[in-house]
């Protein structure tokens, strides 16, 4: 479900959310997180939360290391394993360059482009995930 920015602010206040995990994925599919306080939400929605991309393999070097995380409002989720008091919520993020253009290594943007390109050719995708382990 897509929430508005004001609905997310209201939800954060009503549910006693103390931290928001800004979640993204590196080029090998590993989940990465940055935590922000609720008072940083306005900045996250408008300009994004800056991070040093040179710290993530494949994301850039020191010369092009400024990237920004901008939350996708349709992905708000309260993390259930956290306490009822001082809760933590998660938002998946788009990765943007400082000029607002999408970062070419953003796996979610790459997937969306593939889906859009396929739809333009009359093809649709169905995705699923599977938990797997070996003993």
Where are these regions (language model features)?
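ATP/Mg2+-dependent ligation/transfer catalytic cores
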Residues: 1-135
